[in-house]
Amino acid sequence: MTSNVSAITEASTSKFVRIKEGDGEVQLHYNDAGQGAETVVMLHGSGPGASGWANFNRNVEPLVAAGYRVILLDCLGWSKSDPVVCDGSRSELNARSLKGLLDALDIERVHIIGNSMGGHSAVAFALANPQRVGKLVLMGGGTGGPSQFVPMPTEGIKLLQGLYREPTIDNLKRMMNVFVFDASALTDDLMQARLDNMLARRDHLENFVKSLAANPKQFNDFGPRLGEIAAPTLVIWGRDDRFVPMDVGLRLVAGMQNAEMHIFSRCGHWAQWEHAEKFNRMVVDFLAH
């Protein structure tokens, strides 16, 4: 593997590609950094204003430095990718998008890191394309089914859906205050960037609400099929996750053929950001061994 960590910014890595979806074509945005022989794809969560870069900007450079090519996909309906109303499985839609992207880039096999919705989508991709998956890292998602201890939808999910319906700075603050364990770590610049990204694409916000109306269960439960996944999997969770409770992660570990789990203390739903240094070391070691 080779390492190239110079000039890794959102702008310098920003790219677009057109892929087939259904009877037509859609445009995907992605960030592409590094030149390694192995590729790591990172899939973001479903919050308003989310993007590959916003979710994983603290994690790109360590992976590139370790010798990987790193691709951050903006899923359809988020950031600079095309809008979409999803009346079926969002997980499977994102899995198809990832396959289309990899086919377009002529990449056969990847490791996938998925946060929340991205974890669900990684599982969907692994089930549909097992031969194209090296290792999986799943944080705060992965379709392990509903929590056995916390009423669904959770506090965090209710706030997320409320923010989609009323995209205001006050509602953003309410959601972010339970998104992470220590909300004091959220800078004004971070909050403003999230707000700007959210309001820049009101079509995405409106389409998410339309999608929920068309199909309230956007992320189907793959729990009964988890045993089909043979890829080595690292499940990472925040002990204090108020969006997707920790017991959901335990069900992933119990269901998959070859999974292990790490639980971060004093951590909410954003492990790769809240504990970035430890997370990066752990993931680089897991992928290498």
Swiss-Prot record:
Catalysed conversion reaction: (2Z,4E)-2-hydroxy-6-oxonona-2,4-dienedioate + H2O = (2Z)-2-hydroxypenta-2,4-dienoate + succinate + H(+); (2Z,4E,7E)-2-hydroxy-6-oxonona-2,4,7-trienedioate + H2O = (2Z)-2-hydroxypenta-2,4-dienoate + fumarate + H(+)
Family matches, as InterPro entries: AB_hydrolase_1, AB_hydrolase_fold, AB_hydrolase_sf, Epox_hydrolase-like, MhpC_alpha/beta_hydrolase
GO BP of this protein: 3-phenylpropionate catabolic process; acylglycerol catabolic process
Protein family: Belongs to the AB hydrolase superfamily. MhpC family.
Organism: Paraburkholderia xenovorans (strain LB400)
Domain AB hydrolase-1: 39-275
Gene3D superfamilies reported in the protein's UniProt record: alpha/beta hydrolase (3.40.50.1820)
Signal peptide per UniProt: none
Positions marked as site (Catalytic role in ketonization of the dienol substrate (substrate destabilization)): R194
Active site residues of this protein: H269 (proton acceptor)
Assembly notes: Homodimer.
EC code(s) of this entry: 3.7.1.14
Keyword terms of this UniProt record: Aromatic hydrocarbons catabolism, Hydrolase
SUPFAM superfamilies reported for this sequence: alpha/beta-Hydrolases
Pathway per the UniProt entry: Aromatic compound metabolism; 3-phenylpropanoate degradation
Function statement: Catalyzes the cleavage of the C5-C6 bond of 2-hydroxy-6-oxononadienedioate and 2-hydroxy-6-oxononatrienedioate, a dienol ring fission product of the bacterial meta-cleavage pathway for degradation of phenylpropionic acid.
GO cellular component: cytoplasm; membrane
Pfam families xref list: Abhydrolase_1
Hydrolase listed as a keyword: yes
Keyword Cytoplasm: no
GO molecular function terms listed in the Swiss-Prot or TrEMBL record: 2-hydroxy-6-oxonona-2,4,7-trienedioate hydrolase activity; 2-hydroxy-6-oxonona-2,4-dienedioate hydrolase activity; monoacylglycerol lipase activity; protein homodimerization activity
Site (Transition state stabilizer): S116
HAMAP family: MhpC (MF_01654)
Name of the featured protein: 2-hydroxy-6-oxononadienedioate/2-hydroxy-6-oxononatrienedioate hydrolase
